Each structure stands twice: as C-alpha cells, then as structure tokens.
Amino acid sequence: MLKRFLILLFIVKCSIANAQFNGALPTYKIQAGDNWVKAKNYYLLALLQQDKQAAKLISADEGLSGIGKNKLQALKSSLVDCKDGLCLPAALKFTDDEIKLVSDRLAALYRPGNALDRLVKTNLIPSGTYNFFGSDDPSALLVKAWQQDAFALNFAIGVYAEGKKPNYPLIDSISFDVRKKAYYTLMYDCSAEVAANTHNNALFFEPALNAALTYLEINERVDAGNFEPMATTVNKAAVDKIAGTKWGSFPYTHILVPGAGPDNLTTPLSGEGMLRCKAAARQYFAGKAPFIVVSGGNVHPYKTKFNEAVEMRKYLIAKLRLPASAVIIEPHARHTTTNLRNDARLAFRYGMPFNKPGLIVTDKSQNDFIMNMDKRCLKELNYVPYKLGKRLSETELEFFPLISALQIDADEPMDP
C-alpha cells in the first residue's frame, strides 16, 4: 500500500513539474549528435537527421522530397549561372512559399503515435527549446519549430554569406568584404563544398543547413559549440557536486558574475572583470551560495581569442582561491540579457532548485542597467528569462530564473 502511494506521489510530482515548466524536463539531455552548433541553433532539423524513422517519413513525402531536389538543383545551377558572390548563397535560402509548403506537409504528415509525434513528445517538448510555442498542440509546435529553424537558416546565410547586418554589427559581422573579387571566389568555393557534401537523396532542408554551417565555420563563428558538452567536461566537477548540495544551508543557489571584456586583443581579463570576481568571491566565502557562475563569451574586442568566463574562472581559482568545483563557466553569452538567460539554462539543466533565487554580483552601473533590462529582453529575445528580487546593495541583486530561458534565439547563431 505504501509503495503504491509513493509511486502515485511521484507521478503527481512529475505532472506538476511538467506543467510548471511547460513540458520541459531538467533531466532531458540535448541530443547534439556530432555538431553542437547545429543542435543549439536548429534543434528540430538536427533531430530529424538523427531520427531514422522521422527521416524516412519525410523522405517518402513527394512534396518535401521535391523541395529538396529543387534546392539541390538550384545550388548546382548557381555554380554555373551566378556571376557575382551574392547570387550564390541566395540560391540556398528558403523562400516564403517553400516555408509554407513545408509547414503544410509537416502538418499533414503528423499523426498521433507516428515518428513525428514521438519526436515532438520525447524530444522537442522536454527539451524546452521551443517552449515559446507551448506544448498543448504537438502538431502546431512541430510546424512552428520548423518555421523558426527556416528563419534561423536564412538569417545565418544572410549575415555570414550575404553580409547583412547582424543585431550587433561591431562584434558579430561577416569576416569578409563582399565588395572584393575574392568574395565571389569564396562564395563559389562554399557552394561547391555544400554541393559535394549534400547527396542526391538528402533531406529537404540539408542543402540550406549545410550551407549555414559552412558559412558560420569560415567566418570563425562557431562559438555556440565551444566547450560543449560542458556538463561532462569543463563543468563536470561542479555538476557532480550539485547533486549532493544541501540547498537549505544557503540563501542563494549560486552567484552570477557577468563578464566585462577588455578593450584590446592582448589583455585576457579586464580590470572590471577582476573587480567583479573579487566582489563575488567575498559573497561566496561569506556562505551566500555554494557555486559561482561566471558568464561571458569571446566578445570584446571583435574576434578576440580570450573568453570572459574562462578568464574569470582562472582568476577565481588561481588568485582568489576558490575550489574548482565551485566555479561554473557559461562561456557563450555576448550581452547582459544573455548572461541571465544562459545562466537560467544552466541552473535548470544542472538541477539547481528553480524556485530559489540566485544572486547577481557585478558593478553598480551594470546592476542599474539590469534593473531596467526587461524591455531590452522583450525586444531582443521576445521574452524575459528572469524575475528580479531585491536590490541588496549597489553590487548585489537577487533574481529568479524562468523556464522561458530555454527558448532558442533564431537570430543569434553564435549564442542561440
């Protein structure tokens, strides 16, 4: 009787957690396959490639296979017909009509219990990566996830092949001058590489997907995959420690330290970054939290080889004597908005209590900015990935992570 009661209680708790997180599960592991850049930017497409039954289903559809053949033929024709660099990548992008046709075909193919249904329910929903679209209608979620991935492919091709402006041109722009003759040669060679790497029976989206990944690589913009899988490598010691942490002994789950990039290419860690680490270390040693999350990517200046999170971790351990198992790196964020978003993702994936606050420790100026950052989040992310708590001092600010943070950002391929 007791055993039956405990099983029922477990099921109820799981159901409550499932509803609370819009279907996302903290135990879910991202199925990255052999390419984290692909999985983090275009998760539905990555899953379709990995799931043999789902791939078979969409390959057998005449409408979808027809689009794939047309895209591959357009790619091959562009190598003969295109006389300027911009013409070549344009052939690989999806048109609005193609996106709609794929949407219609996916909706028609979806059936309860089939491969697409299983993919949505066992991967898309528990991953939380498309939770902005809800989980009540799996068929609609599949279509919206496709539309987001198609937009993301077109965006990456537009910025890193056609030279269109990214959201932050000073740090995220294309690496090449589209006005120079060498640009045409480079684009031709990219298209030739994509054609050689895409077989005749490819899935309908693979020419565009291979192109986007190729353009990101030649621009040295594969930051999204750096240090992955973090939970089993650079953050393993901390992740292992989280499982046995007595959370009731601390007022906060962790301390978040946003990075501050230097203003030159030779300085690993800025003075501001050092000061933020010192302030965070004081709070750690005062027993405020069992972990410090240092957040920041390879951001400032343009094309820097130094990573903010990595350099802060080194400083905390070597200079401030924190145990390595207490420092978690979040090495991808490129803005303050994504410092908080990515931190929330790690807190969820690593199993920290989501109903307990974290503590931001930074300088007065940045905390002033964070206090009014919700509008910036809505503009750039379409959601706010946190809820603020009390401002304890000029340098300390409470916050609660929100599950919305798991949503992929389709127009930031270096940190989606």
Model-derived segments and spans:
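Bacterial Sec-dependent N-terminal signal peptides
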Residues: M1-Q20
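A structural signal for short, hydrophobic/glycine-enriched beta-strand patches
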Residues: Q20-P416
